[in-house]
Amino acid sequence: MSKSDYYEALGVARNASDSEIKKAYRRMAMKYHPDRNPGDKEAEARFKEAKEAYEILSDPQKRAAYDQFGHAGVDPSAGMGGAGGPGGPGGPDFADIFSDVFGDIFGGGGRRGGGGRRVFRGADLRYNLELSLEDAVRGTEVQIRVPTQEVCDACDGKGTKEGSQPETCPTCKGHGDVRIQQGFFSVQQTCPRCGGSGSVITDPCRKCGGRGRVQSQKTLSVRVPAGVDTGDRIRLSGEGEPGENGGPPGDLYVQIMVREHEFFQRDGANLRCEVPISITKAALGGEVEVPTLDGRVNLRIPAGAQSGKVFRVRGKGVKPVRGGPQGDLLCRVHVETPVNLTKKQKELLEEFGRTMDDTGDKHTPRTSSWLDKARKFFEDWKL
């Protein structure tokens, strides 16, 4: 059975805090509690799903591994009993579920064993792919190595030694589920012995320990289309975990993450950049050379340009991956105050300042307006 995303299972964002994850789990546990939803199989499944998600996301190390590699990063075989998996001789003791009043309710549903009769699709995997802005905008092809679980070639995924066959589970009599009565509680849950398969492996394969799978890695080629951005996903069909008992494999989702750039910031289809200009260039106008992802362009600065003014270079942005017009490059200028002046430069600026004294309202209207407001403020408050 394909596993859902753990963050989606709890209804939280991927950057959710520990407290947000804990609150979300409590809310889901109360809503889908089996005692509140007797006989509701869907509620029971959601309850177990939320519990499993919380077990991973509440652990910093497991969460980091899951964020990087998805379900494979937290070891899909974890939680399977001993050498034989959930249906092997190392399976959990049936009595363990009676540890306390809520032990049966909060006990997880074991994963399906390799020797069961039911057929399930493999779990989906996720891989975080970090790209430069240039590669994201232009498109590229990269090779990635991902951890995966492959079908054991020694037993062909059956989990048993050659000549051996799974046996009917003695705990659930082949049903895959057990009902537990404890006081006022009556809970039906996945059989802890066979993990819901209805069968147990008494003579497990030595190579895979009865799981039917072995840990491995594979190299895949990923074609990244031009225009992708952080948060986009690329689906590689059939590259997830193999299915159980002959089921189809899951998919691999490549999650795009674009690194910060030295010059540009992505804003949808547009690119933004900061351009420092000198005080003389701002006052007199001129041209300044700015970079684009296609090369250099000359940006025309009109006389009297103010700091913070944004100039548009059309067609130098991003062509959206889902179609639409190409974006623009938005250049925000900042007038830079000169520093480390020579004596001569200071004298020239002082002379320039004196020529502005009588005509400031004409050349610097914002400053003159601000000074007028400040004077009025002082007069009103007699400061």
Swiss-Prot record:
Record carries keyword Metal-binding: yes
Domain J: 5-70
Predominant localisation class: cytoplasm
Region: Disordered, residue numbers: 230-249
CDD domains xref list: DnaJ, DnaJ_C, DnaJ_zf
Cofactor: Zn(2+)
Residues reported in the UniProt entry to bind Zn(2+) 1: C152, C155, C205, C208
Pfam families recorded: DnaJ, DnaJ_C, DnaJ_CXXCXGXG
Ranges occupied by CXXCXGXG motif repeats: 152-159, 169-176, 191-198, 205-212
Cofactor note: Binds 2 Zn(2+) ions per monomer.
GO cellular component: cytoplasm
Family label: Belongs to the DnaJ family.
Subunit structure: Homodimer.
Protein name per its UniProtKB record: Chaperone protein DnaJ
Gene: dnaJ
